[in-house]
Amino acid sequence: MKLFVGLGNPGKEYEQTRHNVGFFVIDELAKRWNVSLKTAKFRGLFGTASVSGEKVALCKPLTYMNLSGECVRPLMDYYDIAIDDVIVIYDDLDLPPGKIRLRLKGSSGGHNGVKSLIHHLGTEQFKRIRIGIGRPAGGQPVTDYVLGRFTEEEKPAVDKAVLRAADACEQAVKAPFIQVMNDFNE
């Protein structure tokens, strides 16, 4: 089973924030694959489907960003999901709004949700799809920026990136991730 995890924060006040683009991609995949995301005992929204003959699972941790690993590790253990079958989707300050970048592994890059995953999974060896949100301008604190909403100017590029990231996830169901990287990295 492939597990697609979108990082974000639960609650109405965070729904459309930059930090929640991982949730946006999971919502898009749920729509495409007709998956109903339900609250699971793993402190997250979770649903499964069969896509191109492959079993897939979607997850939106409800632990808040900095504790994402507390949801994902028990889920992987319960369903016996290998680290090779996990793809994590999240926001990246170091990419401009609308850019996506796929990686096979890596450090947290300062992202607290990814730090939590690395801590709870015990490895950096999981696949990632990073969606650019850009950096704050004019000395705005990073926390305020990531918890802020996209500007009207940023929205079209971000909407396109969410669709591209979902397309990459769809391809990753069947294709080797290295091929998906070659097709989607800009």
From Swiss-Prot:
The record marks N9 as: Discriminates between blocked and unblocked aminoacyl-tRNA. TRNA binds at Y14, Y64, N66, N112. It is found in: Cytoplasm. InterPro entries: Pept_tRNA_hydro, Pept_tRNA_hydro_CS, Pept_tRNA_hydro_sf. Disulfide bonds: none annotated. It catalyses: an N-acyl-L-alpha-aminoacyl-tRNA + H2O = an N-acyl-L-amino acid + a tRNA + H(+). NCBIfam families: pth. Monomer. Belongs to the PTH family. This is Peptidyl-tRNA hydrolase. The gene is pth.
